[in-house]
Amino acid sequence: MAVENNTQRSYSIIPCFIFVELVIMAGTVLLAYYFECTDTFQVHIQGFFCQDGDLMKPYPGTEEESFISPLVLYCVLAATPTAIIFIGEISMYFIKSTRESLIAEEKMILTGDCCYLSPLLRRIIRFIGVFAFGLFATDIFVNAGQVVTGHLTPYFLTVCQPNYTSTDCRAHQQFINNGNICTGDLEVIEKARRSFPSKHAALSIYSALYATMYITSTIKTKSSRLAKPVLCLGTLCTAFLTGLNRVSEYRNHCSDVIAGFILGTAVALFLGMCVVHNFRGTQGSPSKPKPEDPRGVPLMAFPRIESPLETLSAQNHSASMTEVT
């Protein structure tokens, strides 16, 4: 029910946000927590070939010793798109040239008789909320893939230290079905079984692509043609280098990084195009044109074609009038 031209009354937006959106978000965060911080989901024990050179790379150390540690990665992934969206929305709202189009796309929502939700607040919550949901969803997909496949890292045999004396491992092509012959540190071995897909690659490309889609869809720069491309390509390049770092440190295979890039790209494209609709506002339904009165419009109209008989008759009539005069 419309109250004014730019105000719309809604009694369902707040209950839907509390009892649907927040519940789904809480369930997603909880599932990501169980994957990340508990042993609820056991990793598949995968076998390996004896003396496999692809699994005997040097141990690069713990994840905290990596050039891009998990703490730094998660902070940058969460903060960068959030800051871009927050600054971008506030800037567009207070700039006169973009504020008019923003207000035209988003209506002021009146909930009940007292509470107003401005277009600025709705857009910030929508875009950042969808980004956070996608970030946790990508983490769930990655952990599920690692648990199901149990793909071994390039340094697996280095930390596994398998007991070959208890197996028939005379040939290099001998496959060991029993993956429980490792004698190394169990915690390190557990992490060495979680290689596919690469979590760093999936999360970094998701965050970078989501931010890039927001920049290209909402931010308008008439004075500079290269500002947006440089910012977007720089963001995507950072994600690409993050994946390459995983390969250079022997923490993931090339196939793991590629799969992570594909996964993160798919999630970002789906949310950006199908959920937030390329970061466009929810425009009101355009007013339908008033239908014409059917009584004043003919059912079918044809172009008038002059008959040859009428032409000949007119000529004869003209000739007869000439003779009379």
Curated annotation (Swiss-Prot):
Topology of this chain in the membrane: Multi-pass membrane protein
Any one Gene Ontology BP term: phospholipid metabolic process
Segments crossing the lipid bilayer: 13-33, 67-87, 127-147, 201-218, 230-247, 257-277
Highest taxon of the lineage: Eukaryota
Entry annotated with the keyword Phosphoprotein: yes
Primary location: membrane
Subcellular location field: Cell membrane; Cell projection, Neuron projection
Membrane as UniProt keyword: yes
Residue positions, PTM Phosphoserine: 307
UniProt keywords, alphabetically: Cell membrane, Cell projection, Glycoprotein, Membrane, Phosphoprotein, Transmembrane, Transmembrane helix
Carbohydrate attachment residues: 5, 163, 316
This protein's GO CC annotations: neuron projection; nucleoplasm; plasma membrane
SUPFAM superfamilies given in the database record: Acid phosphatase/Vanadium-dependent haloperoxidase
Family classification: Belongs to the PA-phosphatase related phosphoesterase family.
Role: May play a role in neurite outgrowth and neurogenesis.
Protein name per its UniProtKB record: Phospholipid phosphatase-related protein type 1
Gene from which the chain derives: Plppr1
